[in-house]
Amino acid sequence: MSDYKSTLNLPETGFPMRGDLAKREPGMLARWTDDDLYGIIRAAKKGKKTFILHDGPPYANGSIHIGHSVNKILKDIIVKSKGLSGYDSPYVPGWDCHGLPIELKVEQEYGKPGEKFTAAEFRAKCREYAATQVDGQRKDFIRLGVLGDWSHPYLTMDFKTEANIIRALGKIIGNGHLHKGAKPVHWCVDCRSALAEAEVEYYDKTSPSIDVAFQAVDQDALKAKFAVSNVNGPISLVIWTTTPWTLPANRAISIAPDFDYALVQIDGQAVILAKDLVESVMQRIGVTDYTILGTVKGAELELLRFTHPFMGFDVPAILGDHVTLDAGTGAVHTAPGHGPDDYVIGQKYGLETANPVGPDGTYLPGTYPTLDGVNVFKANDIVVALLQEKGALLHVEKMQHSYPCCWRHKTPIIFRATPQWFVSMDQKGLRAQSLKEIKGVQWIPDWGQARIESMVANRPDWCISRQRTWGVPMSLFVHKDTEELHPRTLELMEEVAKRVEVDGIQAWWDLDAKEILGDEADQYVKVPDTLDVWFDSGSTHSSVVDVRPEFAGHAADMYLEGSDQHRGWFMSSLMISTAMKGKAPYRQVLTHGFTVDGQGRKMSKSIGNTVSPQDVMNKLGADILRLWVASTDYTGEMAVSDEILKRAADSYRRIRNTARFLLANLNGFDPAKDMVKPEEMVVLDRWAVGCAKAAQEDILKAYEAYDFHEVVQRLMRFCSVEMGSFYLDIIKDRQYTAKADSVARRSCQTALYHIAEALVRWMAPILSFTADEVWGYLPGEREKYVFTGEWYEGLFGLADSEAMNDAFWDELLKVRGEVNKVIEQARADKKVGGSLEAAVTLYAEPELAAKLTALGDELRFVLLTSGATVADYHDAPADAQQSEVLKGLKVALSKAEGEKCPRCWHYTQDVGKVAEHAEICGRCVSNVAGDGEKRKFA
């Protein structure tokens, strides 16, 4: 028996079946770095229209986590897809490098500034620490396959950036948005200093817990609100607090707009409480006989006035989201000078930020006769006695609770309003202009707009000053007596910025005021405050985007971060850009959700459900992580677990196998010589290229809309359904058995070539490593990297006017599906082994019959059977299977007649008819020794 294997065109490629991504990707990365792939892309895209995605800087502290990976991968997918869409899309990664977390790390290792080190040495250590953190994170980001200018990132601690941050503040001052005010901060009376959040520890402390009645000014108005008239005694709103010493600074009572508040009659008076807390309050104050007279929503009580029990003035009821039903009365004593929530709501309602307490923790003169000069922690008993005397105390008891203490002295601390610098939301119309700018931005998802609008509408002035060591100095001089800014402030800030550009922020602390103020130096002092780190990152549209040469003066098109950044970077950037330039710093803002585990739980080390991106890359490879990110709808929470990543790996295999099939069957194909013109191609091959064209239209639309999960779904449908279960199945016979250089085979290879050229580009933004690998195995002359080109433009399809158009092949797909069902049943019944052992008769209504007949003998190749005939629908025997999908079709199956050809495996009547090739069929003889078979349709 002759061996005809050598006469077959068997698939062959060096492209491996297994991805082995974890092992292969580092080698590819090394090549990308050695070749300067990012630089190659920039050179290729020079002069094209720009798309600038400005990187929100992660904080330079700690290893990257799965959330960082999601963020950087989404950005990379956009940048690469924009490049393929014909844009020059430079990507400059950045890092946020100043601020408290870095200070704390350095303090833990070296001690506080001024202890073992000077402040200057401390800043140098902070700079050093931040640089090592940047290096660690950069390696992991590069490993993800993210392309960017990693050799020249922007750091907020770059001298030039620090200088430009100072210039940004100067511009805001010049536009009239800065003012000085007071804001409550953690204050240690022993240190006589403000404390950062991280310098606060919590210990148990015993304090008096009191319920206090504030009597209504207009009793009749309250009766009307509750629609009651028969009230016995005065009406009061009851607050509960564990800090009686703050009552002299009370300026309002906060209630919740949506809670139900009850008017409760007790002995000789009526009190207002949250309805859900009535029972617990009555138990606490020892009242058993009470009646609820009526209820209203908290919003109904807004701005009604109540009398302070001992300070001699009225205070309003105001609405606040910070009010809870966890404890107390549902009405919160509000002292804007002694608490952050109180301060924020106080700003909203224009309340006085009263601060009757000095830096040593004693009441200032003129506070109240029995309190002046008394330490606040010794004043609680005095205040309780005062309330009792005034008849306003409903209840007092001792209560143990967790209380903030100084980490150095272990003593209780207070909130105390201190002078700070603010960007005003309203003095020059910043709020109104920002709200206007928001409307001109595209928010993705669109609910982001309402979210940030509400935040801007309700936010207080922005406190931008900090009393820290490692930060950009405010670089201001104020008059010793008047505390007014120097009249030449903008000029002086520019002088400071020039020095910082050369020597970094230390230049400010080294500066002797005389150097730039001359004789005026004696009248002015340097402001010691640094800027809030959100000012650093929020001004990068100016300090980075406006000055980097690759951005060529273009503003950012997109900001992309997690949904928590509406109140973070998106907000600070909007405030600063609008205050500086009168416009938003971005055209589009895209937000993604947070990562959760497979059960939807938040990632937590204590639960043990975190997924480490480093582990995923080391086990599965970065492309699997990238595919998971792309295939997840980022607009909501993004679930990740080993099981979910395994599913991503399964999808990856399907795509890789499709790519491998294409490459293996392009063996020996030279597009320059072997390409078949579209009009000479087999119709089914043109249909397949048309499928790729339709898929490309959908995929490009999805990339344009940033719907990456739609890209993945469409890619999977193309690989699995349109190619895998139909076209690639059908062409194997022609591809393997036809004459190597025949039109029948070259037509097929032409289609595979066009499909591969398109597919590799669709993959590139998401499966970057695999696309690069595929690119290296594609035949024909090409650029070195897929990332420098654009979407493939060589696709074409069938015209609707053709008889065998897309609709024709759609119907054929259905027919084949029905035939497959019959074959599967016959296999289950052991009537046939495989589909080539079968011959089918299709009993069809005239319209369908005409289509099937048009394929002639090639119908059997579409159906993957050894025989296929078409007959009249009404001649179908009783055992013919009625199609459920096509009403005018019945299918009958019989065992194929003739012998099995060992070369093509078809059963035919003409095996052995040619003496020289006695073992194979006539078609194979023609393909081996003759002119080769001709195919027109399939």
Swiss-Prot record:
Note on how the cofactor is bound: Binds 1 zinc ion per subunit.
Database matches in SUPFAM superfamilies: Anticodon-binding domain of a subclass of class I aminoacyl-tRNA synthetases, Nucleotidylyl transferase, ValRS/IleRS/LeuRS editing domain
Protein name: Isoleucine--tRNA ligase
Record motif 'HIGH' region, residues: 58-68
Phylogenetic classification of the source organism: Bacteria, Pseudomonadati, Pseudomonadota, Gammaproteobacteria, Enterobacterales
Assembly information from the UniProt record: Monomer.
Pfam families, per the entry: Anticodon_1, tRNA-synt_1, zf-FPG_IleRS
Annotated residues for binding of Zn(2+): C901, C904, C921, C924
Amino-acid positions noted as binding ATP in the UniProt annotation, renumbered to this chain: K605
GO terms under biological process: isoleucyl-tRNA aminoacylation
InterPro entries in the cross-refs: aa-tRNA-synth_I_CS, aa-tRNA-synth_Ia, Anticodon_Ile_BEm, Ile-tRNA-ligase, Ile-tRNA-ligase_type1, Ile-tRNA_ligase, M/V/L/I-tRNA-synth_anticd-bd, Rossmann-like_a/b/a_fold
